[in-house]
Structure formats: structure tokens, C-alpha cells
From Swiss-Prot:
Family membership noted in the UniProt record: Belongs to the nodaviridae RNA polymerase family.
UniProt keyword annotations, A-Z: Nucleotide-binding, Nucleotidyltransferase, RNA-directed RNA polymerase, Transferase, Viral RNA replication
Region annotated Disordered, chain positions: 879-981
EC number: 2.7.7.48
Keyword presence, Nucleotide-binding: yes
Organism in which the protein naturally occurs: Atlantic halibut nervous necrosis virus (AhNNV)
Name of the top EC class for this enzyme: transferase
The name this protein goes by in its record: RNA-directed RNA polymerase
Amino acid composition bias (Basic and acidic residues), ranges on this chain: 915-936
Polar residues bias locations: 883-898
Length: 981
């Protein structure tokens, strides 16, 4: 009995131990402990590759297209041009990043670089074998070579890779100078001139991937073979499957992938390894995708089909075709899935049914029908759309394009597809564009200004009156200390310049100019930025800052230094004093300054203001601004004469003073006395101005012309009509201070950036966030920005970190006092009218934006067809586009080099259904009725101004002013008009 009890107790104990052990081994506690141990082992064994993040960022920022042409008569000229351009682009990126190229299969042109030359094709036998050592200073460069290389081994070296490669977005199709098909997952590529190759395609369509490297040395391979023979490998595999880790393992390299579009089916791919580990420590397939070959083939018993899905701007597209056939069809993936569902549900299916369901031509529908008959279970690979460079242009013609082989540098990027099918263009950085800049912005305008100038004795007297009115008491001004100027210049580059020049007082006055990086509606002469020596700018700034604070800020027409809310209030105060407002446009304002305006108005004001103790120094600083020797970035010398140096400390205030003087002079010539003419100047900000309509158009333009300026009246707006100032459209400033950013110009460039330093995703968020501050209620602009942000990862941005965002969000005071906005439905009419659409068409597209969910690359685009004529002949999008003819210029009297495109917005009140003028939708209301969304802001005569901006006094007649455009900075506003190019 005791023996039985003993055995029972022993069995119970054993059972308890087994059950307890099993429960313990399968418990979450043990799993967590093993996982924690595995994580610690991974942390100990993984290695971070040095500078990987920095290299990736540098490649993204430095990726600027360099175009290289080939000789005429080349058997496949277009393909060779793109290939050579890609190679030069990659070499440029590597060298600008501070690394050395290591070229695999270099051409004779790259013989000077380190590299590896092996024999992959007959053409390789022209050169000798070589295999230079790869170091940590190298970035590997490949042009059409990755198909033949073991990419797993190459990436396992831990060295960054740049390659130009074929990445088809369809299963067959045309390429430059040839075509391609796909059979057994291999591309068959045929090019004119005899090139005929077959190869597999690597799948780079993930942003982060891994690759497993195989043993390369003799002893490593021997150890692997012994482990396989003795069963150790099988045991390790069992432990790996059960525990997620095991002894031994192959090296695993993790890397990032970025793709940049070069042409149809052609990309530059950047691979940057950032970490290594061992395959035995982690279930790597659960962490991400392994680098593999593309799989196009969809096998079945009837016919082998190829399929690939491409994520385009309009959404996913699927390409289908029989293996080896050139004929293929591409259609939206959603449409194909709908057709396939209908095919499966239908009892009888004929080709005519597929034609009707797909909406495709009969020939394309036949391919779809054949695929449906084959009952392919499609598992197509997905190809992503790479990031694009924005559209760039280059001046052509005998005057500028003296080197036909020159290919300029591109810099602007797109962070999303354009809101419109029409997009802005950017001048590339080239010697021909520099010549066009000097001719179109300085030399040409100076010559025309001198031919127009006609200074009379009366004008000289009026100039003296203007100077005395602005500076009533002479000799009271003193400059601020230079330390004050340095405190205002807080940007890193400004601080560095201050530090470098603090102990150097002497300087040589040489102007160094460069072409401004900015967007244009259509090709135009690039703007010129002319910088002056640092000490000249700092010393002169000590006077301009002091004069601004003591004098300019206290005159009612001066708008710089005011917040957006204050400027909007000033616009409304001006409107309240008159029944008509006038917008004007200065063409090439900086380039049309002549000696009279500089010395008798601008300089005379500063010299009258300054104390005698400082007059000599100020006089020398002002004299330096005239006829200084100048040279462009690429070494072109030119004479700026008396034109405005756009990088000077005088730019904003000097332009504002000149703008105000033209208005004042016109008033005096119209018969007003000094005080009355002063009160009717209007408001100005640089070359932007707005005034009342009590002076005729002819007198305004003739007055400006006699001073050398080229002034045109853009809009004479009666009460209740839209008015534009500082590139913002006021629906009706007589009743509301609300405004919107000029829609057409903004939407052309909203998706682009000239910032080559910041991450493209960060720029996209910062730029859309900035517009949501200034224009969250603006139809289309606000909707597009919200749609972009809704479909990407949120970010926290500091506006001060970005240079390509609206000026009005860079200052905390501006942010807290932004532009007044209104949600009135009348804004839909304004936006639609400027885009050349009906309001219904605009609202339909806005509904698409509000409903869209998906990648930002698929944001809906609105089709527009506004005529945007180039202002000069350029090469753009692979074609030469001619500028306006001289005959057209003579016929219509327009200036082909003007800054403004033909305005699309109705510059008077919108027409009603009966054809008569009306004030947007206000005529739909009965007499005495008001729009609840538009607040009446007209000040009563007995009420004081509601803001700190001095209101324009309301004399007995109506007032004056001039218009212009967007301001990019208080230190240097640049001319970009409401519909500029």
C-alpha cells in the first residue's frame, strides 16, 4: 500500500512538474523575458554605420540635374544624352557631398576615378580589368550596371550607392530610341543602333529594406559547409523558429532607398546602408522587405501574363500584357478590379462586354479580356513614383546662349503634385540665364529709362518740397551703433559674416550678383540679386534703421514694419476716403532707377536728416551705391549704373520713398499744393502701391515715365470691386478688410520649393502650415493645404528654419496679427474667375480635395488652360519656346519683358447675367441688405482709427498710389506681381 502511495505521489509530482514547466515555457512572462534578452543581444551586436543619416540628407539636398549632350548623329542620341546626364548628376552629387566616386564599369570618360571594371558584355572588352580598393571615403556610382551585379554583396559592404537604372512602370512600352518587353521576369531591351540586352530588374520600391550577405572568404564558406554537414544548421534553424534567435547567422544590412525621376521608366536610385546585424538574432522578414528581383509574371494554365502596379499622381495604375508582347494596356487599378468583378459575376462574357465595361478601345480591351479569360490571380509588384525636380528653363538665342552645349543646374523641387495641371517654372543656374538677367533686368531697363527721362525745373522744385516734407527739420539724425545692426541680423549666415568682418573696417566696393532662385508663371528674365560688401551693408544699415525708426514709421503712406492686420486696416481706411482705387505696376523697378531719383530724392532725404558729424561718412556710403563695378557668380562683368542694388540696405525704404514720390509728383502736376499732394499719396510698400483715383491714368504713367520708370495702370477699381495690394486680393475693401493670397500665382507654385537644404517632407508641412495661417479660409488654397496635411505625417516646424515660406509668418508679431479673413461665399467667385473657371467647376474640385484620402502623390489636380506667354525664348520641357514677337509688341504696345502676365481676373466688378457690371454677389441682395459674412469696417468720420496705422486723411477729392506685388522680406522686397511670370 505504501509502495502504491509512493508511486502515485511520484507520478503526481512528475505530472505537476511537467505541467508547471510547460505552462512556464509557454507563459507570456518567459516569452517577454526571452524577447527582452533578444533585444539586448541585438542592441549589443548591431552596428550603426557612421554618417548614414548625414549622407542620405546630403544626397537628397544635392540632387540637382546636370544635363550633358552627345554629338549629333549618335545612333541613340536621346538615350545616350539621358544616360550621360545621369552619370554627371551622380558624380556631382558625390563630390558636392564631400566624398569620392567609386564607379563600377566606368566609361573611358570616368577613367580618372577609382572603380571596378569587369566583363559583363561585349562592349566591356574595350577596357582592361581593374578593381580598386573601396574605402569609407567612397560612394559607389553605377550607370545601367546594377542588373549584372550581386546587389546583396555590394550593399553588404556598407558603402552608399548611387545608380541610374531602368525601373519600368509598365510591362512593355517605348523608351528613348527603342522599346522593351518582358519575358520570364527578364526585360528585353532594344535600342536603335543595335543595342539588345536582357536582364532582371531589382525591386527598389520600399523606403527601407534589408539584404542578407553570404560568406565571401574561404574559411567562412568552409565553416558554413561543415555546419550544414553536421546538422548544426538544421538545429539552429529549429531554435530560430521557436525562439526567434539562434547561434551563428549571416550578416544583415539595413538601408534606405530614395528614387529621383530622370525620364520615362528611368530613375536615379540612392541606397544608403545605416545598420548591420546578424540574421540569427531577429526574424528579419517580419521587420521589412528584403531586396529581391521584380516579379512580373502571373502564371496560369492558359497564358502567361505580366502585370505591374504603378502609383501615379492620379492613383494606382495597373499595366497588363502577354509575356514577350509589345502590346500592353494600362488602366486605373480600381477600373480593372470593377471589370474583373463584373466578368466573374456574369454568366456569359464576350469581348464586347469587356469593351463596354472598361471603356477602352477594342484593341486594349482585347488584352484585358484575354487576361480575364486566363483567370490570373494577380499579385503584381508595386512601383512607386519617384520625387521629381520642378520644371526649369534656360535662355536661348544668339544673345545669351553662346555655348549650345551648356546645361544649367536645376535646384527647385516638388513636395507634391501641383494643385493645377499648369505649374510654375524656374530658371536654371547657367551662364546664358545670367546674360539674360543682366540684359533683361539691368542693361535693357537702364537704357530704356534714360531714353524716357525728362526732368524739368518744376520737377526739381517738387522734389525739394517732398524732401522737406518728409524731413522738416534738418540735421537731427544719428546712426545706430553697429552692435544694434548685428543684433537685428540673427540668421546664422549673417552672424558668421559679422564675426568674420568685425575687426576689418576697410573694404573694396565690388557688387557680387547672382540670379534669384524663384518661381515664375511662365519663362521670364530671371531677377538679379546684387550683394554689396558686408561692411558697406552694416554701416549703411546703421543709418537706415535709425531713419526708419525716427521718420518713416511715422508717415501714413509707409507700410513696411506694420503687421498684416495693420496693413489691411490701412487699405480699408484708404478705400473709405475715396470712391475709386488705383493699382499700378512698375516694370523692372530696380533696373529703372536713374541718377535724379537716387541723388535728388533718395540720397537728399538721408543727407538732410543726418547730423553734420556723420554727413561725410553717409555721403561716401551712398556714393558707393552708384556705378560700382559688378560681377556675376559665373564671372560675367557688368555695369549696374544707377540701378537699385537689390542686396543693399536701401532697397525696401528707397523703393518705398521712390514709389511715394511718383504719386506725390503726379498729385502736384495735377494742381494740388504740397499738403494736399502729400495727403493723397496713398500707401506704399517697396514698389507695391495703392492710391485713390483722383489723378488720371495718363498723368500717372507720364509722370513716372519722365523719371525713367515704366508704370502701367493695372486696375482702376470702383467701390465694391476687388482690389489687390501686396499680392493679396481684397474682395471689397470699402466694406471688409478680408483678403486672400492671389490664387492663380499661388497655386502655380504652392507645391514647389527652392529650399535645397531641408527635408522635402518637412518643407511640405511647413509651407502648407504657413498658408493655413494666412489663408485657411481661401477657397482651393486652404482646401489643398488641408488635404496635403491630412494625408501625410504631422510635424512640428519652426518657421525660422525655412527660407521658402511666406514672409508674413516668419515674425511672431505678424503671426499674432495675420491677414483678416472671411468665409464669405463670394470668394469662390474671385478664385474661379482668376483661374478661368466657373464657380461650379471650382466647387466640384474642392469637393474632391475634401474627400481625398491616400498618398500625397495622388492629390487631385485641377485642369486649367490659361495662356501664359514666355517673356523670352527659352528651352523648357525639352522644347524651345519662343518669346513674344516684335510685331506683336509694336501692335499692342505691351512690353514683352514686363513682369506681369496678361491678368486673368476681372479687374472690375464681376459681370451679372445681364452683362452689366455688378459687385460680385452683392447685387443679388436687395437695397439695404448686407452680407452677414462681410463686416462693415468703414470708419465713421467721428471715429478715430482702430489701429496703430495712421489713416489717410480724407480731403475733398479722391486719392492716389501704385501697385506691385509680393514682398519676401522687410530687408529686401522683390518684385513678384499679381500675375507675374
Amino acid at each position: 500500500m505504501r509502495s502504491y502511495e509512493f508511486h502515485l505521489a511520484r507520478m503526481s509530482g512528475a505530472t505537476l512538474c511537467v505541467v508547471t514547466g510547460y505552462r512556464l515555457l509557454t507563459s507570456k512572462w518567459l516569452a517577454d523575458r526571452i524577447e527582452d534578452y533578444r533585444q539586448r543581444v541585438i542592441a549589443d551586436r548591431k552596428k550603426i554605420i557612421r554618417d548614414a543619416a548625414m549622407i542620405r540628407t546630403s544626397v537628397q539636398k544635392q540632387m540637382e540635374l546636370v544635363r550633358i549632350s552627345v554629338r549629333k548623329g549618335h545612333s541613340h542620341q536621346e538615350a545616350a544624352t539621358e544616360r550621360n546626364s545621369a552619370t554627371e548628376t551622380m558624380l556631382s552629387v558625390v563630390e558636392k557631398s564631400g566624398y569620392e566616386p567609386y564607379i563600377i564599369s566606368p566609361s573611358p570618360r570616368e577613367a580618372e576615378y577609382h572603380g571596378s571594371r569587369q566583363f559583363y558584355s561585349l562592349a566591356d572588352f574595350r577596357q582592361d580589368y581593374r578593381r580598386d580598393e573601396i574605402t569609407d571615403r567612397h560612394i559607389i556610382v553605377m550607370t545601367d550596371v546594377d542588373y549584372y551585379v550581386d546587389m546583396n554583396e555590394l550593399i553588404g559592404l556598407g558603402v552608399p550607392v548611387l545608380m541610374y537604372t531602368f525601373q519600368p512602370s509598365t510591362v512593355s512600352g517605348e523608351v528613348k530610341d527603342g522599346y522593351f518587353t518582358i519575358t520570364d521576369d527578364s526585360v528585353h531591351y532594344r535600342v536603335a543602333g543595335g543595342k539588345d540586352v536582357r536582364h532582371r530588374i531589382w525591386n527598389y520600391n520600399q523606403d527601407t529594406m534589408y539584404t542578407v550577405s553570404r560568406p565571401t572568404g574561404f574559411w567562412e564558406n568552409l565553416k558554413r559547409i561543415l555546419r550544414d554537414i553536421t546538422g548544426i544548421t538544421a538545429l539552429c534553424g529549429f531554435l530560430y523558429n521557436k525562439l526567434g534567435m539562434a547561434p551563428f547567422g549571416d550578416p544583415v544590412t539595413m538601408f534606405t532607398v530614395d528614387q529621383f525621376k530622370m525620364g520615362e521608366h528611368r530613375n536615379i536610385v540612392s541606397i544608403v546602408p545605416f545598420a548591420t546585424c546578424r540574421s540569427n538574432l531577429l526574424k528579419i522578414s517580419e521587420y521589412g522587405a528584403e531586396l529581391e528581383y521584380m516579379r512580373y509574371q502571373q502564371r496560369n494554365n492558359i497564358a502567361n501574363f505580366n502585370a505591374v502596379t504603378y502609383i501615379s499622381e492620379e492613383g494606382p495604375l495597373i499595366s497588363l500584357g502577354l509575356e514577350g508582347n509589345f502590346a500592353s494596356v494600362q488602366l486605373p487599378l480600381q477600373d480593372f478590379e470593377n471589370v474583373r468583378t463584373a466578368y466573374e459575376l456574369s454568366k456569359t462574357n464576350n469581348l464586347s462586354d469587356t469593351v463596354r465595361r472598361s471603356g477602352r478601345p477594342c484593341k486594349e480591351a482585347a488584352i484585358i479580356h484575354k487576361c480575364l479569360q486566363a483567370e490570373c490571380v494577380l499579385a503584381s509588384e508595386v512601383v512607386h513614383k519617384p520625387g521629381d525636380l520642378a520644371r526649369h528653363y534656360q535662355a536661348v538665342g544668339s544673345l545669351y546662349d553662346v555655348d549650345p552645349a551648356e546645361q544649367g543646374k536645376c535646384y527647385a523641387r516638388e513636395y507634391a503634385p501641383g494643385p493645377l495641371t499648369q505649374t510654375a517654372v524656374f530658371p536654371n543656374e547657367s551662364r546664358s540665364n545670367e546674360r539674360a538677367t543682366i540684359d533683361g533686368r539691368i542693361a535693357g531697363p537702364q537704357a530704356k529709362a534714360k531714353s524716357r527721362e525728362h526732368i524739368t525745373p518744376r520737377m526739381r522744385k517738387v522734389a525739394r518740397d517732398f524732401v522737406r516734407h518728409l524731413v522738416p527739420e534738418a540735421g537731427l539724425g544719428r546712426p545706430y551703433p553697429l552692435t544694434y545692426v548685428e543684433e537685428q541680423q540673427s540668421k546664422p549666415l549673417q552672424r558668421a559674416r559679422n564675426d568674420a568682418n568685425r575687426y576689418h573696417d576697410e573694404f573694396t566696393m565690388i557688387v557680387k550678383a547672382f540670379q534669384k532662385k524663384e518661381a515664375y508663371n511662365a519663362p521670364n528674365y530671371p531677377r538679379n540679386i546684387s550683394t554689396v560688401p558686408h561692411n558697406q551693408n552694416v554701416k549703411l544699415s546703421s543709418y537706415t534703421y535709425a531713419f526708419k525708426a525716427s521718420t518713416l514709421q511715422h508717415v501714413p503712406w509707409y507700410m513696411p514694419t506694420h503687421t498684416p492686420a495693420e496693413i489691411a486696416d490701412a487699405v480699408q481706411n484708404l478705400a473709405a476716403s475715396t470712391t475709386e482705387l488705383v493699382e499700378t505696376d512698375y516694370s523692372k523697378f530696380d533696373g529703372t532707377f536713374l541718377r535724379f531719383m537716387r541723388e535728388c530724392v533718395e540720397f537728399a532725404i538721408y543727407k538732410r536728416w543726418v547730423h553734420l558729424d556723420h554727413l561725410a561718412e553717409l555721403s561716401q556710403l551712398l556714393a558707393n551705391e552708384l556705378q560700382a563695378p559688378a560681377v556675376t557668380r559665373l564671372g560675367l562683368k557688368y555695369d549696374p549704373d544707377c540701378s537699385r542694388l537689390s542686396g543693399s540696405a536701401l532697397t525696401t525704404d528707397g523703393n518705398s520713398i521712390a514709389n511715394a514720390f511718383v504719386s506725390y509728383l503726379a498729385n502736384r502736376l495735377a494742381g494740388m499744393d504740397d499738403d494736399e499732394a502729400w495727403s493723397w499719396i496713398g500707401i506704399v510698400y517697396g514698389d507695391d502701391g495703392l492710391r485713390s483715383g483722383n489723378v488720371s491714368d495718363t498723368l500717372l504713367t507720364d509722370t513716372a515715365s519722365s523719371l525713367g520708370f515704366d508704370l502701367k495702370i493695372v486696375n482702376r477699381a470702383p467701390r465694391g470691386s476687388p482690389v489687390t495690394f501686396l499680392a493679396r486680393v481684397y474682395l471689397d475693401p470699402w466694406s471688409s478688410p478680408a483678403s486672400v493670397q492671389s490664387p492663380f500665382r499661388t497655386l502655380l507654385k504652392l507645391h514647389t520649393t527652392c529650399d535645397t537644404q531641408s527635408e522635402i517632407e518637412d518643407i511640405g508641412w511647413a509651407k502648407t502650415q504657413a498658408y493655413l495661417v494666412t489663408d485657411c479660409k481661401t477657397p482651393f488654397i486652404g482646401h489643398w493645404c488641408r488635404a496635403y496635411q491630412r494625408n501625410c505625417t504631422a510635424r512640428v516646424v519652426q518657421y525660422a528654419d525655412y527660407n521658402d515660406i511666406p514672409f508674413w509668418v516668419k515674425n511672431d508679431d505678424h503671426l499674432g496679427n495675420s491677414w483678416p479673413q472671411s468665409d464669405s461665399v463670394d470668394w469662390n467667385d474671385v478664385v474661379a474667375n482668376e483661374l478661368g473657371l466657373t464657380t461650379a467647376e471650382l466647387l466640384k474640385h474642392i469637393a474632391l480635395l475634401e474627400a481625398y484620402t491616400g498618398p500625397t502623390s495622388g492629390l487631385p489636380r485641377l485642369t486649367t488652360s490659361i495662356d501664359l506667354e514666355p517673356k523670352m525664348s527659352v528651352a523648357l520641357d525639352g522644347e524651345v519656346q519662343a518669346g513674344p514677337s516684335q510685331q506683336q509688341t509694336d501692335k499692342d504696345g505691351t512690353n514683352p519683358t514686363g513682369d506681369r502676365s496678361a491678368p486673368r481676373r476681372a479687374r472690375t466688378a464681376l459681370p451679372g447675367v445681364d452683362g452689366h457690371t455688378r459687385c460680385t454677389r452683392r447685387s443679388d441682395r436687395g437695397p439695404g441688405e448686407r452680407d452677414a459674412n462681410v463686416r462693415d469696417k468703414r470708419p465713421r468720420r467721428s471715429m478715430p482709427p482702430s489701429r496703430s496705422v495712421s489713416s489717410v486723411p480724407p480731403p475733398s477729392s479722391s486719392g492716389g498710389g501704385a501697385d506691385g506685388d509680393r514682398v519676401e522680406g522687410a530687408a529686401r522686397p522683390r518684385r513678384q506681381r499679381r500675375t507675374p511670370v
